[in-house]
UniProtKB/Swiss-Prot annotation:
This is 2-oxoisovalerate dehydrogenase subunit beta 2, mitochondrial. It is found in: Mitochondrion matrix. GO terms for biological process: branched-chain amino acid catabolic process; cellular response to sucrose starvation; response to absence of light; response to sucrose. Induction: By dark treatment. Down-regulated by sucrose in a hexokinase dependent manner. Up-regulated by Leucine and its derivative alpha-keto acid (KIC). InterPro entries: THDP-binding, Transketo_C/PFOR_II, Transketolase-like_Pyr-bd, Transketolase_C. Its cofactor is thiamine diphosphate. Heterotetramer of alpha and beta chains. The branched-chain alpha-keto dehydrogenase complex catalyzes the overall conversion of alpha-keto acids to acyl-CoA and CO(2). It contains multiple copies of three enzymatic components: branched-chain alpha-keto acid decarboxylase (E1), lipoamide acyltransferase (E2) and lipoamide dehydrogenase (E3). Required during sugar starvation and acts under the control of a sugar-sensing mechanism involving Ser/Thr kinases and phosphatases. Signal peptide: none annotated.
């Protein structure tokens, strides 16, 4: 059995990127004329089709992925590429990730799906103590850099405390992995392809609230968006706002309302949380003198605290006000009281006003 698995999955250890028609988009490049209007889940699906098509050593697996997945992100993959490359797994997250580590260590590209980010915790040991440290503890003789773990995360309006959590901060404390969160269909496709082809393990969180809500023109060809490069979504002079994922939609609405009050807001999408783009945030804060960070996860120990600490270290004498955080509450994610838990537009707008008027 073991020998058969080795023969099936061992494909060598190199990860060629050039020569396959890939193109790297800058974070500000315009969508090509060949772009097609699609939502976020369709963009994810298209990226997975491209990943499997361009590399015969790539595999997709997880709970119900053979049927298209609960959010339909893997629709059509099993029919097109066969059940030997796209297949279902038992309901066992540590097994899904552990199997993915083994496949990646044998030179394959692995896209392992955790059905909901809330259930990634049974795989925590595999991600933190195995995937993240595999290269280091072997003295770079072995690695599982071909592993990408996809997981839908965040509020959805009716998920409650088992289907709404944002666990990104748990993984941002771990050297050896990357954490990526897209905000839109175009970003999702390019960032997912970059994550799959990156030589390091990546945890790729997908904001499920945007799966069908976010729609825009997306290039249909094979392209990648660089990891660890933040994007200034809108320029401003009075205050810098930093966020990621679905929360950026709420933050942008707050920026528009603040602009009506004469407050100029600069909005930055981190895209990659680890390693994050410190320079672009620092440059912005040195210009505006103020910083507000917003995320859905609870405020205490959230990744916003790391951003705040870093910017205070780098920009202390340029700050005009304390760094502000507008985040989820320090409570289990509630079902009925979700609107009170969430960092809403009005909460962000109030924080903008108080920070600017400090």
């Amino acid at each position: 059995m073991a020998a058969a698995l080795v023969r099936r999955f061992c494909r060598g250890s190199s990860f060629p990127v050039s020569g396959h028609g890939y193109r790297m988009l800058s974070t500000v490049e315009n969508v090509s004329e060949s772009g097609k209007s699609m939502n976020l889940y369709s963009a994810i699906n298209q990226a997975l089709h491209i990943a499997l098509e361009t590399d015969p050593r790539s595999y997709v697996f997880g709970e119900d992925v053979g049927f298209g997945g609960v959010f339909r992100c893997t629709t059509g993959l099993a029919e097109r590429f066969g059940k030997s490359r796209v297949f279902n797994t038992p309901l066992c997250e540590q097994g899904i990730v552990g199997f993915g580590i083994g496949l990646a260590a044998m030179g394959n590209r692995v896209i392992a799906e955790i059905q909901f980010a809330d259930y990634i915790f049974p795989a925590f040991d595999q991600i933190v103590n195995e995937a993240a440290k595999f290269r280091y503890r072997s003295g770079n003789q072995f690695n599982c850099g071909g592993l990408t773990i996809r997981a839908p995360y965040g509020a959805v309006g009716h998920g409650g405390h088992y289907h709404s959590q944002s666990p990104e901060a748990f993984f941002c404390h771990v050297p050896g992995i990357k954490v990526v969160i897209p905000r839109s269909p175009r970003e999702a496709k390019g960032l997912l392809l970059s994550s799959i082809r990156d030589p390091n393990p990546v945890v790729f969180f997908e904001p499920k609230w945007l799966y069908r809500q976010a729609v825009e023109d997306v290039p249909e060809d094979d392209y990648m968006i660089p990891l660890s490069e933040a994007e200034v979504m809108r320029e401003g002079s009075d205050i810098t706002l930093v966020g990621w994922g679905a929360q950026l939609t709420i933050m942008e609405q707050a920026c528009l309302d603040a602009e009506n009050e004469g407050i100029s807001c600069e909005l930055i999408d981190l895209k990659t949380l680890i390693p994050w783009d410190k320079e672009i945030v620092e440059t912005s804060v040195r210009k505006t003198g103020r910083l507000l960070i917003s995320h859905e996860a609870p405020v205490t120990g959230g990744f916003g605290a790391e951003i705040a600490a870093t910017i205070v270290e780098r920009c202390f004498l340029r700050l005009e006000a304390p760094v502000s955080r507008v985040c989820g509450l320090d409570t289990p994610f509630p079902l009925v009281f979700e609107p009170f838990y969430m960092p809403t537009k009005n909460k962000i707008l109030d924080a903008i006003r108080s920070t600017v008027n400090y």
